[in-house]
């Protein structure tokens, strides 16, 4: 029995030393420095969505979601001070999406009104 306990303790000691060395080697190989992390955060900030009525001229596919649908980048052409046509875009809700959401809100309001009436009757 003593031999079994001594060999178990010896095995655990050797195993813990080996795993500690492997972990140290892994951390040295995969170490992250500030220069490695900064570009990651810059990319994350660039991917944040563009809210409603904000300009999306340079990033037309990155408008936020509002309600049921994602906002669309809607563009218009204007003449600048020099008379050259320039395109300006802003995130907005298309009329079709706006009509659908308004209709659904009215429809939901009808059912909420019926539930309130049932509660007041009983």
UniProtKB/Swiss-Prot annotation:
It is found in: Secreted; Target cell membrane. Expressed by the venom gland. Residues 1-20 form the signal peptide. It comes from the Eukaryota. Residues 21-47 form a propeptide. The modification Arginine amide is found at residue 108. Disulfide bonds join 49-64, 56-73, 63-91, 75-89. GO terms for biological process: killing of cells of another organism. Its main location: secreted. One of its GO terms (molecular function) is toxin activity. The modification Lysine amide is found at residue 121. Residues 99-112 are annotated as: Predicted alpha-helix. GO terms for cellular component: extracellular region; membrane; other organism cell membrane. Pfam families: Toxin_35 (PF10530). Keywords: Amidation, Calcium channel impairing toxin, Cytolysis, Disulfide bond, Ion channel impairing toxin, Knottin, Membrane, Neurotoxin, Secreted, Signal, Target cell membrane, Target membrane, Toxin, Voltage-gated calcium channel impairing toxin. InterPro entries: Spider_toxin_CSTX_knottin, Spider_toxin_CSTX_Knottin_CS. Belongs to the neurotoxin 19 (CSTX) family. 04 (U1-Lctx) subfamily. Monomer. Interacts with CSTX-13 (AC P83919) (Kd=430 nM), but does not interact with CSTX-9 (AC P58604). The presence of a 'disulfide through disulfide knot' structurally defines this protein as a knottin. This is Toxin CSTX-1. It comes from Cupiennius salei (American wandering spider).
């Amino acid at each position: 029995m003593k031999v079994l306990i001594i060999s178990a303790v010896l095995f655990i000691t050797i195993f813990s030393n080996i795993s500690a060395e492997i972990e140290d080697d892994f951390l040295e190989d995969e170490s992250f420095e500030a220069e490695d992390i900064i570009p990651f955060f810059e990319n994350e900030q660039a991917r944040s969505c563009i809210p409603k009525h904000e300009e999306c001229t340079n990033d037309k596919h990155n408008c936020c979601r509002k309600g049921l649908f994602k906002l669309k980048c809607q563009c218009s052409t204007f003449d600048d001070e020099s008379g050259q046509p320039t395109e300006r875009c802003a995130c907005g809700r298309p009329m079709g999406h706006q009509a659908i959401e308004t209709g659904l809100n009215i429809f939901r309001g009808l059912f909420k009104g019926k539930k309130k009436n049932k509660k007041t009757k009983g």
